[in-house]
UniProtKB/Swiss-Prot annotation:
Changing W335R: In HYCX and MASA; also in a patient with hydrocephalus and Hirschsprung disease. Changing D516N: Found in a patient with L1 syndrome; uncertain significance. Residues 20-1120 are extracellular. The lineage of its organism: Eukaryota, Metazoa, Chordata, Craniata, Vertebrata. Residues 1144-1257 are cytoplasmic. GO terms for cellular component: axon; axonal growth cone; cell surface; collagen-containing extracellular matrix; dendrite; focal adhesion; neuronal cell body; plasma membrane. This is Neural cell adhesion molecule L1. Changing Y1070C: In HYCX; partial loss of axon guidance and loss of proper synapse formation, when assayed in a heterologous system. Neural cell adhesion molecule involved in the dynamics of cell adhesion and in the generation of transmembrane signals at tyrosine kinase receptors. During brain development, critical in multiple processes, including neuronal migration, axonal growth and fasciculation, and synaptogenesis. In the mature brain, plays a role in the dynamics of neuronal structure and function, including synaptic plasticity. InterPro entries: FN3_dom (IPR003961), FN3_sf (IPR036116), Ig-like_dom (IPR007110), Ig-like_dom_sf (IPR036179), Ig-like_fold (IPR013783), Ig_I-set (IPR013098), Ig_sub (IPR003599), Ig_sub2 (IPR003598). SMART domains: FN3 (SM00060), IG (SM00409), IGc2 (SM00408).
């Protein structure tokens, strides 16, 4: 058995004795038990007629207990009494008296006591007082009418019959309606009804006192009292007088722990009010209540500190009356130390302590087996000393039951306690060989519950038989438990408990295992987070590997768990994530790491911050100040949500003029909760207040009541007054209208005045509602003095300021006179002109419009492409720099003055920009010629910016960091290719090409590459095959710059039916990009083999479509050899003629390149799209936008069936094309791609849709 010591706590006893009873585990010994009273009736019983009376007395004990009763100290035998029934139960002496009339119940009145005895002693019950009460009756009496004059006091008596049980008194009328009670009319604790002063409305003849007796469940009533009030015309005021109590002071005794009720009822006119005072100290506010309109003071649970004087003070306008209560706090007897029953072994000393307290001090008496000690023989060996009964050297014959009884005038206490002397062998009640587990640093408790008589001594030994108490960490308890504090790993082992008395000794073994303590290695950290965000707490802990670990989370002491219907909490792997933080989430969060042996906790605090809460309350005060357009606003502070409130924003809304729009009246510091506001006349103000902290504004407060300020004349005039004409013969006067909150009345209008400037004549005026006025029939551009004044039903606004306005403008007639144009550089000029005559402007000179456009290049036949640019120059400036111009271009320039009406006539001028450096060449490509040579192809720049004089080509190996750079000046501007030789096949190069004018080289285009990447192992790229019913197309993507080569394609049918038949291998050129094989069989699988230089390079599979073999038509003459030879001869002849034609064309018909360029479309109007392959980049920018805008038609055309055609017609050109047997080039290759280059090397071909000329502009 393993015992975890997590919840084992020791039982501490103050003396070496056992528990009150023999433990149930102590088996095999038949031990007797002294009698013990287990149940008895209350100390006081009140019975009523026809009630049954039950007197209970039950007790336990071995041997069986015998019962006897006494009544008023005389032996009482219930079995012999008529009408008494005794319970037939082994442990009960209870009996019941069956009542049928009041006399029968009264015959059994008295003080009863029960005695329970066996051979070990006698136990005694407390005194049971039985009281009989008859049916309540109101004594016969004659009630005379009560006559009193209006304003006097009166007391209506009740005087109910006496009762042993508390009564409830009610005053009602004959209609069973309660008499209304207030400060003037009050019922006292004694049941009387007190009138401080009577009114004529109190005149009734049916004041009835009802008494409710809860014991008998009956209500009886007094004869009605007739109260007759005599009316009077002059009620006399009088000072208060106490009706109860009637004297000036009283002395009361209050019982400790019971409630205290004090009462003062006064009369007088006007009706007095009651106050309560305590001169000796403050009232205990937490225990005092005031009832019955302050006439009754009730003090709950009276204590000794409540002793002293209490005063009631009755006051009205004529004086006061008072009464002093002097309260003495006393107490019924109560236990300080109650005697306890114990078992003792022979020779021990027995001591029973009976310590009581009370006020007055209780008298203590002792009994032994129910007999007072004074009546016992004097040779008894007990002694009574300081409230204790002591017996020395007890023996089994000294077994007894004692009674300690304490009484004073407020009550009685009784306690039974036995001294049981017995001899029992020692026995350890704790199981043997238990295993206990605890963690290092904690305290372990090894149990050894022993029992015997005399009480066995308990000793703990280690495995060596040595007492463990030599180590100060080991400590014993009186109940035999061994405690070991500050456990260490080497405390693991076996321990032995030895219990012994004078009869025997016994031993058990306990096993202790000490485990590693749980430790939190990384606990959660306190943090401050914003509302609505999420927070993550982490927790890591180390555990003993043999224990079951657990990490849980707690928030403010409550366990946290993930909720199935909410994602508020996420708990996993020592992490607690709280989503959507709210202010209710702030608090202390704990990581609890636990095993079955220990628990450790690490705590962190979470503060949730955010904008403030709403202002809870808003109050307007000083409303009389509204006549002065002021009001005071007060509010309760808002919740700051852990961030100090920086300010309060006071806003208002006018539901009449601008509903649902709020305006700020100002802000006050955050520590201020009221302010006086300056208001505007005639505004319907509804206020609200918003708190603001560093996280922003909170929710606004509830809105206030609406207040309206009185009307007044306007305090402001419109602003931004202007006079401008929208026609040449008028002037439009405009202004910014007043805000509605500045109207100071329900409506506002504007008084507009005007007159020509410089005249002293009368003002013309007009009152309008709109924020403008049109003055007609004016001269062109004449200045006027203008005033605009606000007016309403209460008067005019302040005297307005005079504003100068002008009538309508006309178009300017002034022409700017150019002073000259200064060429700053090839792309910028400075334009200057003289100021215009303002009289000719016909209005306000707003500035100058400078318009310019490029008419074309200075080169011949350059096409005009007009794109106008505009620059607006301020009126006080007469020059402008035009930048961003195209070099070597002709420009047209216009300058116009303009006013508010428009622009005047223009002055014109033309100028030209000088030459500049050209742009970068277009489309630089590298083509492999051999392992050591490359062919560079390019296009001229789109922007010549002058006359091209040639190109500068430079290159260097990349691996040498720019060393060994070579440069070539290519003087021919028409050059488009250049062949580089003697290159290393193992290096990559950086090539840079620049076009030049007389101003020098321009931007460069850069390309990197080498022969190594272009002339290596043949690469078919992305090769694929598709099939139809009787054909298949093989396609591939030629690698850019790859040297051309020829290879074989072989189709081989698969399957037994096909017999593995192969078609003749076909010779194909790499630059073809595709090959179509015809004459295939439908629904057939084929293998495709690619060979180069008799070496296998690639293989793929394809399957044709269809469902059967294709039937070939009968062979005709087209398949005969003679026909094939004839056709071949014709084709060869045509090819020779075509070659001769190209040679002749290349040698003759040449013309100026410049003339040719000038015949082409302007490069800006129709730029050419580069159709060559490869990439390039500028030295200035790798991502410069290209100027190509149009596309060329495809040069490939439809795919031509190749079959076994080896014709070179597709590779014709101005140079010879020869192949080795393997299909590789012998000479320079200039295939279809060469045809696409416009104006190639030594080419003079005409412009055509597939050979467009390159635009040089």
């Amino acid at each position: 058995m393993v015992v975890a010591l997590r919840y084992v706590w020791p039982l501490l006893l103050c003396s070496p004795c056992l528990l009150i009873q023999i433990p149930e585990e102590y088996e095999g010994h038949h031990v007797m038990e002294p009698p013990v009273i287990t149940e008895q009736s209350p100390r006081r019983l009140v019975v009523f007629p026809t009630d049954d009376i039950s007197l209970k007395c039950e007790a336990s004990g071995k041997p069986e207990v015998q019962f006897r009763w006494t009544r008023d100290g005389v032996h009482f035998k219930p079995k012999e009494e008529l009408g008494v029934t005794v319970y037939q139960s082994p442990h009960s002496g209870s009996f019941t008296i069956t009542g049928n009339n009041s006399n029968f119940a009264q015959r059994f009145q008295g003080i009863y006591r029960c005695f329970a005895s066996n051979k070990l002693g006698t136990a005694m019950s407390h005194e049971i007082r039985l009281m009989a009460e008859g049916a309540p009756k109101w004594p016969k009496e004659t009630v005379k009418p009560v006559e009193v004059e209006e304003g006097e006091s009166v007391v209506l008596p009740c005087n109910p019959p006496p009762s042993a049980e508390p009564l409830r008194i009610y005053w009602m009328n004959s209609k069973i309606l309660h008499i209304k009670q207030d400060e003037r009319v009050t019922m006292g604790q004694n049941g009387n009804l007190y009138f401080a002063n009577v009114l004529t409305s109190d005149n009734h003849s049916d004041y009835i006192c009802h008494a409710h007796f809860p014991g008998t469940r009956t209500i009886i009533q007094k004869e009605p009292i007739d109260l007759r009030v005599k009316a009077t015309n002059s009620m006399i005021d009088r000072k208060p007088r106490l009706l109860f109590p009637t004297n000036s002071s009283s002395h009361l005794v209050a019982l400790q722990g019971q409630p205290l009720v004090l009462e003062c009822i006064a009369e007088g006119f006007p009706t007095p009010t009651i106050k309560w005072l305590r001169p000796s100290g403050p009232m205990p506010a937490d225990r005092v209540t005031y009832q019955n309109h302050n006439k009754t003071l009730q003090l709950l649970k009276v204590g000794e500190e409540d002793d002293g004087e209490y005063r009631c003070l009755a006051e009205n306008s004529l004086g006061s009356a008072r009464h002093a209560y002097y309260v003495t706090v006393e107490a019924a007897p109560y236990w300080l130390h109650k005697p306890q029953s114990h078992l003792y072994g022979p020779g021990e000393t027995a001591r029973l302590d009976c310590q009581v307290q009370g006020r007055p001090q209780p008298e203590v008496t002792w009994r032994i087996n129910g007999i007072p000690v004074e009546e016992l023989a004097k040779d008894q060996k007990y002694r009574i000393q300081r409230g204790a009964l002591i017996l020395s050297n007890v023996q089994p014959s000294d077994t007894m039951v004692t009674q300690c009884e304490a009484r004073n005038r407020h009550g009685l206490l009784l306690a039974n306690a036995y001294i049981y002397v017995v001899q029992l062998p020692a026995k350890i009640l704790t199981a043997d060989n238990q295993t206990y587990m605890a963690v290092q640093g904690s305290t372990a408790y090894l149990l050894c519950k022993a029992f015997g008589a005399p009480v066995p001594s308990v000793q703990w030994l280690d495995e060596d038989g040595t007492t463990v108490l030599q180590d100060e960490r080991f400590f014993p308890y009186a109940n035999g438990t061994l405690g070991i504090r500050d456990l260490q790993a080497n405390d693991t082992g076996r321990y032995f408990c030895l219990a012994a008395n004078d009869q025997n000794n016994v031993t058990i073994m306990a096993n202790l295992k000490v485990k590693d303590a749980t430790q939190i290695t990384q606990g959660p950290r306190s943090t401050i987070e914003k509302k609505g965000s999420r927070v993550t707490f982490t927790c890591q802990a180390s555990f003993d590997p043999s224990l079951q670990p657990s990490i849980t989370w707690r928030g403010d002491g409550r366990d946290l768990q993930e909720l199935g219907d909410s994602d508020k909490y996420f708990i996993e792997d020592g992490r607690l994530v709280i989503h959507s933080l709210d202010y209710s989430d702030q608090g202390n969060y704990s990581c609890v790491a636990s095993t079955e042996l220990d628990v450790v906790e690490s705590r962190a605090q979470l503060l949730v911050v955010g904008s403030p809460g709403p202002v809870p309350r808003l109050v307007l005060s000083d409303l009389h100040l509204l006549t002065q357009s002021q009001v005071r606003v007060s509010w309760s502070p808002a919740e700051d949500h852990n961030a100090p409130i920086e300010k309060y924003d006071i806003e208002f809304e006018d539901k009449e003029m601008a509903p649902e729009k709020w305006y700020s009246l100002g802000k006050v510091p955050g520590n201020q909760t009221s302010t006086t506001l300056k208001l505007s006349p005639y505004v319907h103000y509804t206020f609200r207040v918003t708190a603001i902290n560093k996280y922003g504004p909170g929710e606004p407060s509830p809105v206030s009541e609406t207040v309206v300020t009185p009307e007044a004349a306007p305090e402001k005039n419109p602003v931004d007054v202007k006079g401008e004409g929208n026609e040449t013969t008028n002037m439009v006067i405009t202004w910014k209208p007043l805000r509605w909150m500045d109207w100071n009345a329900p409506q506002v209008q504007y008084r507009v005045q005007w007159r020509p400037q410089g005249t002293r004549g009368p003002w013309q005026e007009q009152i309008v509602s709109d924020p403008f006025l049109v003055v007609s029939n004016t001269s062109t551009f004449v200045p006027y003095e203008i005033k605009v004044q606000a007016v309403n039903s209460q008067g005019k606004g302040p005297e307005p300021q005079v504003t100068i306005g002008y009538s309508g403008e006309d178009y300017p007639q002034a022409i700017p006179e150019l002073e000259g144009i200064e060429i700053l550089n090839s792309s910028a000029v400075l334009v200057k002109w003289r100021p215009v005559d303002l009289a000719q402007v016909k209005g306000h000179l707003r500035g100058y419009n400078v318009t310019y456009w490029r008419e074309g290049s200075q080169r011949k036949h350059s096409k005009r492409h007009i794109h106008k640019d505009h620059v607006v120059v301020p009126a006080n400036t007469t020059s402008v720099i035009l930048s961003g111009l195209r070099p070597y271009s002709s420009y047209h320039l216009e300058v116009q003055a303009f006013n508010g009406r428009g622009s005047g006539p223009a002055s014109e001028f033309t100028f030209s920009t000088p030459e500049g450096v050209p742009g970068h060449p277009e489309a630089l490509h590298l083509e492999c010629q051999s392992n050591t040579s490359l062919l560079l192809r390019w296009q001229p720049p789109l922007s010549h910016n002058g006359v091209l004089t040639g190109y500068v080509l430079s290159y260097h190996p990349l691996d040498e960091g720019g060393k060994g750079q070579l440069s070539f000046n290519l003087r021919d501007p028409e050059l488009r290719t250049h062949n580089l030789t003697d290159l290393s096949p193992h290096l990559r190069y950086r090539f840079q090409l620049q076009a030049t004018t007389k101003e020098g080289p321009g931007e460069a285009i850069v390309r990197e590459g080498g022969t190594m990447a272009l002339s290596g192992i043949s690469d078919f790229g992305n090769i694929s095959a598709t099939a139809g019913e009787n054909y298949s197309v093989v396609s591939w993507v030629p690698k850019e710059g790859q040297c051309n080569f020829r290879f074989h394609i072989l189709f081989k049918a698969l399957g037994e039916e096909k017999g593995g038949a192969s078609l003749s291998p076909q010779y194909v050129s790499y630059n073809q990009s595709s090959y179509t094989q015809w004459d295939l069989q439908p629904d057939t699988d084929y293998e495709i083999h690619l060979f180069k230089e008799r070496m296998f390079r690639h293989q793929m599979a394809v399957k044709t479509n269809g469902t059967g073999r294709v039937r070939l038509p009968p062979a005709g003459f087209a398949t005969e050899g003679w026909f094939i030879g004839f056709v071949s001869a014709i084709i060869l002849l045509l090819l020779v003629l075509l070659i001769l034609c190209f040679i002749k064309r290349s040698k003759g018909g040449k013309y100026s390149v410049k003339d040719k360029e000038d015949t082409q479309v302007d490069s800006e109007a129709r730029p050419m799209k580069d159709e060559t392959f490869g990439e390039y980049r500028s030295l200035e920018s790798d991502n410069e936008e290209k100027a190509f805008g149009s596309s060329q038609p495809s040069l490939n055309g439809d795919i031509k069936p190749l079959g076994s055609d080896d014709s070179l017609a597709d590779y014709g050109g101005s140079v010879d094309v020869q192949f080795n047997e393997d299909g590789s080039f012998i000479g320079q290759y200039s295939g279809k791609k060469e045809k696409e280059a416009a104006g190639g090397n030594d080419s003079s071909g005409a412009t055509s849709p597939i050979n467009p000329a390159v635009a040089l502009e």
